[in-house]
Amino acid sequence: MASLFKKKTVDDVIKEQNRELRGTQRAIIRDRAALEKQEKQLELEIKKMAKIGNKEACKVLAKQLVHLRKQKTRTFAVSSKVTSMSTQTKVMNSQMKMAGAMSTTAKTMQAVNKKMDPQKTLQTMQNFQKENMKMEMTEEMINDTLDDIFDGSDDEEESQDIVNQVLDEIGIEISGKMAKAPSAARSLPSASTSKATISDEEIERQLKALGVD
């Protein structure tokens, strides 16, 4: 019973209209088919009367044929009008659905904008940038310290290996000459094993120097 008193939506109304238009279109097609059948019968009757020389009957039947053909032409015009109405109804339905979708989207965007705080979002992004730069600076300073500790410990050995490899590629004679040449003693500076302490004050100072609050 509740469905009987339910208010029809726009879609329901449009569906009903489309059903009525389709029914009208089918009725027009049936009428046209009947007119075409009657048209053929009249044409045969006119030919029959012409064969027997009945001019008066031919004139009467010819007038009926003209009237019938005009009526058939009208069915094509009406059918085109019904098709146009059906197309227009579909276009209107599509436009209304688009308007409904835009309305829903606008409401969603409005709700999101109410929840969002631009100042808070900006502050969050600035804090992220600040902390990210602090992390990068800390990592860079640690890497520099580690490089100072470990760089150069194997420089002498690696350099000698490279020299030996090149001499082997050039030839034994040159290698022999190079072996007799006095080698320059190099003293590597001892790497400091003391680890630099990175304070928050130092990081803040460098961030301010970079223009990051």
Curated annotation (Swiss-Prot):
InterPro entries: Snf7_fam. The modification Phosphoserine is found at residue 199. Changing residue 206 to H: In FTDALS7; cells expressing the mutant protein have large cytoplasmic vacuoles with an accumulation of the mutant protein on the outer membrane termed halos; cells with the mutant protein also have aberrant localization of CD63 and an increase in MAP1LC3A overall indicating a defect in the autophagic pathway. Transmembrane segments: none annotated. GO terms for biological process: autophagosome maturation; autophagy; cognition; endosome organization; endosome transport via multivesicular body sorting pathway; ESCRT III complex disassembly; late endosome to lysosome transport; late endosome to vacuole transport. It comes from the Eukaryota. It is found in: Cytoplasm, Cytosol; Late endosome membrane. Its main location: cytoplasm. It holds the Pfam family Snf7. GO terms for cellular component: amphisome membrane; autophagosome membrane; cytoplasm; cytosol; ESCRT III complex; extracellular exosome; glutamatergic synapse; kinetochore. GO terms for molecular function: cadherin binding; protein domain specific binding. Residues 179-199 are annotated as: Disordered. Residues 179-194 have a biased composition (Low complexity). Keywords: Acetylation, Amyotrophic lateral sclerosis, Coiled coil, Cytoplasm, Disease variant, Endosome, Membrane, Neurodegeneration, Phosphoprotein, Protein transport, Transport. Gene3D superfamilies: 6.10.140.1230. Residues 25-55 form a coiled coil. The modification N-acetylalanine is found at residue 2. It is a peripheral membrane protein. The keyword Metal-binding does not apply. Belongs to the SNF7 family. The acidic C-terminus and the basic N-termminus are thought to render the protein in a closed, soluble and inactive conformation through an autoinhibitory intramolecular interaction. The open and active conformation, which enables membrane binding and oligomerization, is achieved by interaction with other cellular binding partners, probably including other ESCRT components. It is linked to Frontotemporal dementia and/or amyotrophic lateral sclerosis 7: A neurodegenerative disorder characterized by frontotemporal dementia and/or amyotrophic lateral sclerosis in affected individuals. There is high intrafamilial variation. Frontotemporal dementia (FTD) is characterized by frontal and temporal lobe atrophy associated with neuronal loss, gliosis, and dementia. Patients exhibit progressive changes in social, behavioral, and/or language function. Probable core component of the endosomal sorting required for transport complex III (ESCRT-III) which is involved in multivesicular bodies (MVBs) formation and sorting of endosomal cargo proteins into MVBs. MVBs contain intraluminal vesicles (ILVs) that are generated by invagination and scission from the limiting membrane of the endosome and mostly are delivered to lysosomes enabling degradation of membrane proteins, such as stimulated growth factor receptors, lysosomal enzymes and lipids. The MVB pathway appears to require the sequential function of ESCRT-O, -I,-II and -III complexes. PANTHER family: CHARGED MULTIVESICULAR BODY PROTEIN. This is Charged multivesicular body protein 2b. The gene is CHMP2B.
